[in-house]
Amino acid sequence: MVSSLVNLKACFYSGRMNTTTTTTTTTAPSVAQHGSAAGLGTAERQYLMADDGRHLAASWFEPPTGAARAVAVVSSAAGVPRGYYRAFAEWLAGRGYAVLTYDYRGIAGSRRGPMRQEPGTMRDWAVLDMSAALAAAEARRATQRLPLLLVGHSFGGNAIGFASGVERADALLAVASQVGEPRLYPGVKRWVAEFFFRAWVPGLVATTGHLPGWAMGPGAQAMPGGVARQWARWGRQRGWAFADPAMQPYRSASALTVPVHLWDVSDDLTFAPAAAVDALAEQFRNAAVKRLSISPAQVGLTRLGHFGAFRRDPGPRLWERLLAPIEAATPRLRFAG
């Protein structure tokens, strides 16, 4: 049972801001390393500030040559550091996008002090941290009226529906983003998920003050206690966060009237099965929603899974498939790449 539980991390993830730049600017690796004909962007570390004053680590990736023709914000899966999306951000910058990645409070570069003392919640990640990232993107694009593409992975694509400023986006591309509700998961995985949310997570948080990384599998990041408790509460209720009365004032998914492309990964049955992605599609009721699916075979692999879409391999072979349809469906993005 425990071996099944510790592999469930990604399954059920599913403010205005100021920026202060650091002095660190790095140049991306060579194009040959990524198998892309396009040049790759350069990265600059920054800090965002959310409405409550919390500083968040972030990185801007700029096109290697010429001015940016569009802006993209990449919102991570729950607990996943922004560095995981670096290769994708570099590639996207090479296509002419200015790309923002960022860490939620309590995660990686946005962590301060011992994890058990981190006061953040999932509500904070969506309402404060995502909103801060969108405000940064708005400031970056406002003077040139650049188009804005939102990219979300897992939690980053479902919780964006609570962020302030989402209505100003030109398109949303979400990969393996879902409604993290156990009834939507197939077979025995549903019952494992029920135990995960009703006993495993609450018990560990009560004992340790946070959710340890080892409790979710090899390489997983620890989560603040407040985040884990809210995650478990949402997983125990029908409708996930979208049914939480406390989240209703922040619901903004219905404000999107632009193209929204929601991708499932065919072999991601444990983490974001098609039914869970379908349930998320219902939240964007006023958008031009399109449901799509990608399989490992389409990019020359035998396994892709929940996290494979943002790895360097398959990298551009897959990213082209994800980006081309949303650019084609969004007039302002057609000349971005």
Kindly label every feature range from the protein language model.
Residues A77-V80, S266:
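Active-site glycine-rich loops that stabilize anionic/oxyanionic intermediates
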Residues I294-G337:
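Catalytic active-site module of serine/aspartate enzymes centered on a nucleophile-bearing elbow/loop
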Residues R82-Y84, A89-P114:
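Conserved alpha/beta-hydrolase
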Residues V151-G239:
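Alpha/beta-hydrolase-fold enzymes
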Residues P119-R140:
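Alpha/beta-hydrolase active-site loop
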Residues L269-A275:
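Conserved alpha/beta-hydrolase "acid-adjacent" motif
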Residues N18-T19, P29-E62:
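N-terminal cap/lid segment of alpha/beta-hydrolase-fold proteins
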Residues L256, L262-D264:
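Short beta-strand/loop motif that positions the catalytic acidic residue
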